[in-house]
């Protein structure tokens, strides 16, 4: 009897610890990249998924490209806004955002070496709630 009670209590506690899928602050997750090695004349497409309880996603997605320092002091890193398409407002909204860059947008500045970059993403909604930071896997940008 005691074991049954403890087992039931454990199941109840574990089921109560589930994180809500839809929250007031947008949730942003990195899903994938179309390539992990970007060469000349190619396009990099990074796919993110989002959820938002109020459905008030604004067009504010901030993208950070982070590259280790080059011997010449330049690193090719940047912080820039990325325009998110308009979504019709709906409760418990979810979807994907695809961020695309051509080779010339992110080309390596550490010549003659290849760059290895990671991309970080932050989404803000119309009520100024900010998502957690989503981080890509390392992307090699060839020279």
Where are these regions (language model features)?
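Bacterial signal peptide processing site
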Residues: 18-21
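Positively charged n-region of N-terminal signal peptides that target proteins for export
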Residues: 1-4
């Amino acid at each position: 009897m005691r074991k049954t009670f403890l087992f039931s209590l454990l199941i109840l506690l574990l089921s109560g610890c589930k994180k809500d899928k839809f929250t007031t602050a947008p949730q942003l997750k990195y899903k994938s990249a179309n390539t992990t090695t970007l060469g000349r004349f190619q396009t990099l497409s990074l796919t993110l998924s989002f959820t938002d309880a109020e459905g008030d996603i604004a067009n504010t997605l901030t993208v950070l490209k982070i590259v280790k320092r080059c011997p010449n002091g330049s690193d090719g890193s940047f912080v820039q806004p990325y325009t998110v398409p308009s979504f019709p407002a709906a409760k418990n909204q979810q979807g994907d955002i695809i961020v695309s860059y051509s080779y010339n947008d992110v080309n390596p500045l550490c010549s003659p070496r290849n760059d290895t970059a990671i991309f970080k993403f932050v989404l803000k909604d119309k009520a100024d709630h900010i998502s957690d930071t989503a981080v890509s896997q390392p992307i090699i940008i060839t020279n």
